[in-house]
Amino acid sequence: MAKSFQHPIVVLANGRFPSHSNPLEVLDSAGTVICTDGSADTLLKFDRTPHVIIGDLDSTKLKKSDFKGLWILNQDQHKTDLQKTLQWCLLNGLNDVVILGAMGKREDHSLGNLHILSEFSNKMNIHFVTDHACIYCFIGEKTFPSTKGQQISITAIEHVQSINTIGLKYVLDKESFPPACNGISNEAEGEEFTIDTSLPVWLFINHP
């Protein structure tokens, strides 16, 4: 079924609608835009139309009869609309997804969405793009592009026994890394940096 959707795949969650050029460029270049419930209304206010709407559909003012795209009703009260949307993406072979609107507005929703990122990061290629940063969750070794002086923050989800970095100003060398603030506001030294972590971390690559 994935062949019927145009790539890139962008999911718009119902947090703060993007205003920075980076997430807006992601939205403008999307082949398929999937909205989580009420985010469809926000998208329409900005003269853009979603291709898919997913959720319990109790937040959107749209009616199914007025929507020409794919309308997916999922009333599972034990999952958020973002969880339902990502699960639907997996079931349909959409394994490469960028998420906008995941942060901002309610802080509890933002924190919950970060944990959803960690939940799905080992199942699909996924990251958030916000007005401030690209946010990833990963385990093991991974290299990311950067610019010199770019602000990089690393946050442990649980106590990491060993983490190494290459290409960051403040080096971590097989260090124990607790879920605290000691990984905030590091800096990239050049065009790329590498992190190798024994347990999942959140990585914030702030926009230059």
Question: Residue ranges of each PLM-predicted region?
Answer:
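Short Gly/Thr/Asp-enriched flexible loops that form oxyanion-binding sites at enzyme active sites
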Residues: 108-118
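N-terminal beta-strand-loop-alpha-helix module at the start
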Residues: 1-64
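Class I SAM-dependent methyltransferase SAM-binding "motif I" and its flanking Rossmann-like core
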Residues: 118, 123-147, 152
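Long, charged alpha-helical interface segments
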Residues: 139-208
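Short phosphate-binding loop-to-helix
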Residues: 69-92
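Short, well-ordered alpha-helix to beta-strand connector turns
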Residues: 30-31, 50, 67-68, 94, ...
